[in-house]
Amino acid sequence: MSKYRERIYQHYVNARDSPLAPASISRLTSRAPYLNKVIRGHFPSDRSARIIDLGCGHGAVVHFAQTAGYQNVMGVDRSPAQVKEAQRLGIAGVTEGDLSETLESLSDESVDLIVTFDVIEHFTKDELMPFVDEVNRVLRKGGKWIIHTPNGESPFAGRMRFGDFTHEQAFTRTSIAQLLIASGFSLVTCYEDAPIPHGVKSTVRWILWKIFRGGLRVFFAAETGSLDDCIFSQNLLAVAVK
């Protein structure tokens, strides 16, 4: 690991304006609408499917997957501080480990779903290629890789791309599809991180998002002559099928 990464990751939890982990498990509810939507829409229907969340942080995805009834889900994170936070929150199945080494330890076609939330942007291009190949190797035929990552197509792309000193790159729906299809995945679909209405405040945000998004589409059409349905959110969700 490079020296700059080693220094930053040692203080990844405490060297921030806001904490990465909530004070208690009940405080994870703010992420529930989005993560539950991802789980309902993209996780396997089989609750015994083998699921691995690589770069799981304090285990939010693991927690909501377990709450949804998934029995064989685990998370791995290289940050001891993050794993300690998961343990403090009482989230089972989160362990410390190197992500690439974890993949290398797995048998071919032994996993149904790989999840990486806010992970692949930390790799250089040369580092990412073997990581992608390993994910493809361990996934079963028809298995999925769910990727959440900064969206380089967003008008505010710089906020996410440069908001973390360890970020090496950002992706667009076309560049991430280019990478994954060239690496053996059969289908890649990208989704916008739009607000999810679940109360008054979030509904207002959703309405405003629709209005401003429409304006951005018009702006895009003025330049290109196309009403292409771009992804404008600061992050995107990509789902790749092997």
PLM segments and residue spans:
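Short alpha-helix
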Residues: E168-S183
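Short, hinge-like loop/turn segments at secondary-structure boundaries
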Residues: I91-G93, G163-T166, W206-W209
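Conserved N-terminal segment of class I S-adenosyl-L-methionine
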Residues: M1-E109, L113-F117, D126-D133, Y191-P195, ...
